[in-house]
Regions:
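Redox-cofactor binding/interface segments in oxidoreductases and associated redox assembly factors
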Residues: 80-84
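Short internal beta-strands
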Residues: 37-45, 109-112
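Glycine-rich, highly charged phosphate/nucleotide-binding loops
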Residues: 55-72, 93-94
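Walker A (P-loop) phosphate-binding motif
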Residues: 135-181
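ATP-dependent carboxylate-amine ligase catalytic core
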Residues: 3-10, 24, 32, 49-56, ...
Length: 200
């Protein structure tokens, strides 16, 4: 796994043909809750519009462009795969876009099961689902943690676990409580910039 050392990213979000749909939850989550800047969204079916025109409830705005060349004019540091496409593998056109981005020195960030680092050897790729090699075995040490812990779980994907957790955290902070979001899902890790999304 190669991961850029820059503490802050400026994202171009690749969501071709899907940005306005629920399946683009990684794109939506990063825009709504992420700390990093959004340079633009790439979806040629909505090119010329803005995020606020299409999904005003996300609370942040960015231009929507149709091509990588247009995206590069907004000086992104990273290109995010903004959804998991049906079938779990990226279409060839997306791979071509990612290759061109990598060749331009743009970091690729992906939460897919499909590992992208082997596809782009020597290029900056953050495969979010690639677990770090130093995860210890369960020891029970967590039972001794002083602060209260709220665990959110669900029986399926894309049902609101992350959204509920982040809204609870937001409300708690609004009441002056000290809170920390510990991400475990791929979108959560991208939003928080750390954690573990180790689902193989």
């Amino acid at each position: 796994m190669i991961r850029a050392e820059a503490p802050e990213r400026r994202y171009a979000i690749l969501a071709e043909g899907w940005f306005a749909r629920n399946h683009a939850k990684t794109a939506h989550g990063l825009i709504r809750y992420g700390r990093d800047e959004i340079a633009c969204v790439m979806d040629s079916t909505l090119a010329g519009k803005r995020v606020s025109d299409v999904l005003p409830d996300l609370g942040r705005d960015a231009p929507i462009v149709g091509t990588l060349d247009e995206a590069l004019t907004f000086s992104p540091t990273s290109i995010l795969v903004g959804l998991a496409p049906p079938g779990g593998r990226l279409p060839e056109e997306w791979m071509e876009t990612l290759k061109a981005a990598a060749d331009a020195g743009i970091e690729i960030v992906s939460g897919l099961h499909q590992r992208l680092a082997p596809e782009f050897p020597g290029k900056p790729v953050w495969d979010v689902r690639e677990p770090p090699g130093d995860i210890p075995l369960f020891s029970g040490e967590g039972f001794g943690v002083g602060p209260k812990v709220a665990l959110t779980v669900g029986t399926d994907s894309a049902i609101g676990k992350m959204t509920a957790t982040l809204e609870i955290e937001r409300a708690a902070r609004g009441q002056g409580l000290s809170t920390e979001f510990v991400p475990t899902g791929q979108t959560d890790v991208i939003i928080g910039g750390g954690g573990s999304a180790s689902t193989p």
